[in-house]
Amino acid sequence: MVASRARENQRYSQCRKSTIFPLGFAIISGYIQFQNISILHISRFNPLFYNIFHSIFKNPGTTIQLESTLYYHEVPISPIGNAGSQI
């Protein structure tokens, strides 16, 4: 009984590792790529996007800071594709 339970626990932990590690790696790599995109491309054209992304990433779950950045700039939000057309 103890041996079968240990075998079951080992199988469960292997399954958990095989799902958590790739998922974590995908999230981290996607976050890094998204940060690179937002810092290099968007923030150079439009500081509003830079503030939105960084207020989301620095403290997720707070919309007060996000709203304050929106009202502070008072810039019409454009799609990311033509963010440079406002300047």
From Swiss-Prot:
Entry's transmembrane regions: 20-42
Topology in membrane: Single-pass membrane protein
Keywords: Membrane, Transmembrane, Transmembrane helix
GO cellular component, one term: membrane
Primary localization class, coarse: membrane
Lineage top rank: taxon: Eukaryota
Subcellular localization, as worded in the UniProt entry: Membrane
Protein name per Swiss-Prot or TrEMBL: Uncharacterized protein YFR032C-B
Species per Swiss-Prot/TrEMBL record: Saccharomyces cerevisiae (strain ATCC 204508 / S288c) (Baker's yeast)
